[in-house]
Amino acid sequence: MATPREIKKRINSVKNTRKITRTMEMVSTAKSKKISDRVNASHPFSNKIKELVSSLASLSGVVHSPYLRRPEKIKTVALLVITANRGLCGGYNSNVNRLAKAKVAEWKKAGVNVRLFIVGKKGISFFKFAGEKAEKTYTHLDDKSGYKEAEEFANLFLELFANEEVDAVEIASTVYYSSASQKPEVTRILPFEPAKEGNGNDLVVYEPSPERVLESLLPLVVKTAFLKAILEANCSEQIARRIAMKSATDAASEMIKLLTRGYNRVRQAKITQEISEIVAGADSLN
């Protein structure tokens, strides 16, 4: 049986761990709130501009753009996987990695060549262990990442698509729906999906021409799509870490209770034993 001193040392160790997990929980809560505000603030703009570009793209026979090409058969697809650089966030990384791996297997089974691009150390190590070679890897994204990083990705994949090096661009990431709901999904970015035929407003006169307007706006839509994916992934990571750290803090508190009870029992037993020895010694003297 452990001595009172050993149990006390264990209690202090768990208390120190609880301080760390509680601090990490508070930091993740603050970060997730800040990023979710950015996500919600970007939605009206991204939704409206996507609606406008979708309407422009539906003007069949009027608008032509390399970004609107729709290959009869997809031969090569670019897949961007967004994970975190750090762990301690529950199943956040493993859920995205498993989904992306299943998607890669699905494409390969269909005879499609997959060009893999991975964000985050956790995704890089996962696919390296799985034997999947990544064309490019990125580890510079964090909770402060935003439009600059989104523009970097958008320019790369727009160029690949326009040059017909890939026939489709997809993102595997965690999609943020609310603070209580996040889900790993694969989102198609290119080719761009226009509105249903007939939804384009033919009564609108575009100045300059629809092609010029679309040429400027469509890359912006793609950039906002990447920005949305980055922000939502970061927000989901912080929420997952907050939940994981709260669970760890609660578990530490419960362990401290159990250890304290054990400490009190051992201490009480030791005191009782000492009293018994004193009484026995006094009796022997009499």
From Swiss-Prot:
<comment type="similarity">
    <text>Belongs to the ATPase gamma chain family.</text>
</comment>
<dbReference type="GO" id="GO:0045259">
    <property type="term" value="C:proton-transporting ATP synthase complex"/>
</dbReference>
<keyword id="KW-0472">Membrane</keyword>
<dbReference type="GO" id="GO:0042777">
    <property type="term" value="P:proton motive force-driven plasma membrane ATP synthesis"/>
</dbReference>
<protein>
    <recommendedName>
        <fullName>ATP synthase gamma chain</fullName>
    </recommendedName>
</protein>
<dbReference type="GO" id="GO:0005886">
    <property type="term" value="C:plasma membrane"/>
</dbReference>
<dbReference type="GO" id="GO:0005524">
    <property type="term" value="F:ATP binding"/>
</dbReference>
<dbReference type="InterPro" id="IPR023632">
    <property type="entry name" value="ATP_synth_F1_gsu_CS"/>
</dbReference>
<dbReference type="Pfam" id="PF00231">
    <property type="entry name" value="ATP-synt"/>
</dbReference>
<keyword id="KW-1003">Cell membrane</keyword>
<dbReference type="InterPro" id="IPR035968">
    <property type="entry name" value="ATP_synth_F1_ATPase_gsu"/>
</dbReference>
<dbReference type="GO" id="GO:0046933">
    <property type="term" value="F:proton-transporting ATP synthase activity, rotational mechanism"/>
</dbReference>
<keyword id="KW-0375">Hydrogen ion transport</keyword>
<keyword id="KW-0139">CF(1)</keyword>
<keyword id="KW-0813">Transport</keyword>
<comment type="subunit">
    <text>F-type ATPases have 2 components, CF(1) - the catalytic core - and CF(0) - the membrane proton channel. CF(1) has five subunits: alpha(3), beta(3), gamma(1), delta(1), epsilon(1). CF(0) has three main subunits: a, b and c.</text>
</comment>
<comment type="function">
    <text>Produces ATP from ADP in the presence of a proton gradient across the membrane. The gamma chain is believed to be important in regulating ATPase activity and the flow of protons through the CF(0) complex.</text>
</comment>
<keyword id="KW-0066">ATP synthesis</keyword>
<keyword id="KW-0406">Ion transport</keyword>
<dbReference type="InterPro" id="IPR000131">
    <property type="entry name" value="ATP_synth_F1_gsu"/>
</dbReference>
<keyword id="KW-0997">Cell inner membrane</keyword>
